[in-house]
Amino acid sequence: MKKGLLTMAGVLLTVSLVSAGTTVPVLAEEETTLVYGSGDYTRINPAMDEHGEINILIFNGLTAHDGDNQVVPGLAESWDFDDETNTYTFHMAEDAKWQDGEPVTAEDVKFTIEAIMDPENGSENAPNYEDVEEINVIDDHTVAFKLEDKNVAFLDYMTMAVLPKHLLEGEDMQTSDFFRNPVGTGPYKIESWDEGQAITLVKNEDYFKGEPSIDKVVFKIVPDDNAKALQLKSGELDLALLTPKDAAAFADDEAYTCYDMKTSDYRGIMFNFGNEYWQKNRDLIPAVCYGLDRQAIIDAVLLGQGMPAYGPLQRNIYNYEDVEHYDYNPEKAKEILEAAGCEMGDDGFYYRDGEKVGFVISVSAGDQVRIDMAQIAAQELKEIGMDVSVEIPAQTDWAGQMAFLIGWGSPFDADDHTYKVFGTDKGANYSGYSNADVDKYLTEARQSADPEV
């Protein structure tokens, strides 16, 4: 079962952040506004959803990450760890306040993590806190977490945004109106939300870590990648994350600054193993792997700014290099199909037990990189005799799809990605992948600080 899941059409990305007008001086008395080209939001709910760009501006966790991805204080000024009892004790800043003026307390922390852990709430982040055995409020500004076992990523997970108990207790954690008008502790607070157009944040003058230097940050909703580049060029945006193709137009323009960053972010085809087709044809997945020319996809879509990926942790110290590499080999792909009993039809496609061999790749609308990758992958697989097509559904339906062009990568410790994406029945395991050996290794890895484990 393991083969084929982690290696499908895998490519690691280099992303380009482009900003405009960086050399224009601003008078001290003028209001400063930064307009960022953002994807759309239906809610701002850090506890239930994956990390969002806007979350860290509105909320704080007990811990935070610095520019080198190291854990630093957030709402907690310090913390202790008792190795004998596996207990973390966090000592919180006493001057932190909610944006409605109420003090932030240890009860808020306990409320937030318990809400995430509650299976009734269906949080994607629940696997991160499976090891929490007890949460004890020592006093208003001290909270202790007793773990069942070691979890080397626990301090990373405490970057989770703390939510206000006094506003959310008794509310539905998925549908509450709070998540359309959130109140946080962070450097910015919501000024307005024009649905489908923009979310405007204004600085929090009472922020406990100091007043921000930029007065307003506008998340302008521009879901289409090409449109972001056009609006950056026209001056409608100050900052945008662009595809390599779109960023190339700004590289030699002195009016813009381009930041190219190597990432652990990857794109790949993930199969829905709950789908009847893959339950019958799982043995054909290696043929898909050999039928994909990853380097050709990188050159065409990313202008060479990437590398073939053969696992989810390739640019991570936890990467294991000796995995099987399904390098491009169309002839071997055909051999696998024929060995499985597939026969070539008059239309140029293989058939198995009278059924055409092929599947549909679903892709999110507006993400041109994924769309382009999926279309090239589909064409490459057609060339080896698999009838593969691409669809762009209006809404994501994980259970109803055969396969999807995914984008993932751990923002900090590898556990944050692998445990909940590939662990059986975990919060972000949309593929339905299940392997008892993998579950065992994932559990062992989160309990060890040794990168070799």
PLM segments and residue spans:
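Gly/Pro-rich hinge or "lid" segments in bacterial periplasmic/extracellular proteins
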Residues: D66, Q70, T159-P212, K216, ...
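N-terminal lobe/hinge region of extracytoplasmic solute-binding protein
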Residues: G37-F81, E114, V183
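Aromatic- and charge-enriched surface segment that lines or borders ligand/interaction sites
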Residues: E77-G122, A144, W278
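Surface-exposed binding/hinge segments that line
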Residues: D80, A126-L168
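Ligand-site clamp/hinge motif
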Residues: N204-F250, A378, D387-S389
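Ligand/substrate-recognition segments at binding pockets and active sites
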Residues: E343-P411, P451-E452
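Extracytoplasmic/peripheral linker and loop segments enriched in polar/acidic and small residues
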Residues: S389-D397, Y419-V453
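Append "and occasionally in soluble cytosolic enzymes with long acidic Gly/Pro-rich linkers
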Residues: K280-I376
